[in-house]
Amino acid sequence: MSVFTEHREVRVTARESIKTPFVAPELSTVRTVDAELEKGTKGWTDFSNKPEVVNVPTSEIAAEREAALVEDITITGDTVIRKAPRKNAPKVRHPRPTKRRWA
């Protein structure tokens, strides 16, 4: 049967998703992270250097906020929370007829 099959012309095109050529790991340059870790260079990988924390609330303010949060979060049985309507829900109008149809 393969004698009677038609020949198809197939062309291969370059893939658009792959732009960078392949480079073997042993031929590629050293990553910045590896260089910093090997040399002990102080860089963004240095975790022993802690940044200063700015605007830390005092203990009184923190305690007030905590109390307000606990008060807001406590659940009581007398409050009914209605579910808000969806923003993308269709708006349906049911206008009344202008004339009485049963008269």
Swiss-Prot record:
Comp. bias intervals (Basic residues): 83-103
Span list, region Disordered: 82-103
Protein name stated in the entry: Gene 89 protein
Gene from which the chain derives: 89
